[in-house]
Regions:
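RNA-contacting regions in translation and RNA-metabolism proteins
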Residues: 1-195
């Protein structure tokens, strides 16, 4: 079964996807068992695979996610988490849903998500275990589905004008709850007779 998909890449991100001497493109091709052709005039990245192996079924989709993530502002190193982590996924949030057509509103929302010297973005990343990129009119998030859900809620709250303090409190509470859930799971698996 052959696979082919086109991903539109902004011109300023084509060089990042190719990498120095084609290194990044080559790594994605090798790790995902795909062929990548990039048209620098149109910005189209054509990802194709001819593999018929069952284990290779998901690899072309991972390549699509990695290239999409890099095209939305992630560094290749951070985007490789999508290949390395079996449970990791990529989600894109369109900020136009909150800012409308106003460029001033868009800049204000992006500023709230990034924070002063990137503090807000780093705090969300640290408390959720995700990677976050604010690029153009979108926010990209890489992490597990649970991590993405919490980070997405934080981005949505900030986009709707909630205070940073209330967002950080929500993140702290979610982190505390996740820790308790992990401890309960560990106890249930290691001490079933105590229940």
């Amino acid at each position: 079964m052959s696979f082919q998909q086109v991903v539109r890449v902004p011109r300023d991100r084509i060089g990042v996807i190719i990498g120095k001497n084609g290194k990044v493109k080559g790594q994605i091709q090798d790790r995902c068992n795909v062929l990548i052709e990039i048209d620098s005039k149109t910005g189209d990245a054509i990802i194709s695979s001819q593999s018929k192996e069952m284990s290779a079924e998901m690899e072309p989709f991972k390549a699509v996610e990695v290239i999409t993530a890099i095209s939305k502002g992630f560094s290749p190193r951070r985007a490789y988490r999508l290949i390395d982590g079996d449970d990791d996924a990529f989600q894109l949030i369109d900020l136009r849903d909150y800012a409308g057509k106003s460029s001033n509103s868009m800049e204000r929302i992006k500023g709230r998500i990034i924070g002063e010297e990137g503090k807000s973005r780093r705090t969300i990343e640290d408390l959720t275990g995700t990677y976050i990129s604010v690029y153009g009119h979108s926010v990209g998030i890489i992490g597990t589905s649970d991590q993405i859900k919490i980070a997405s809620d934080a981005v949505t709250m900030l986009s709707k004008g909630k205070s940073h303090k209330s967002v950080y409190n929500m993140l702290q509470e979610a982190k505390r709850k996740a820790k308790i859930d992990r401890m309960r799971l560990w106890e249930d698996n290691n001490f079933p007779a105590l229940r």
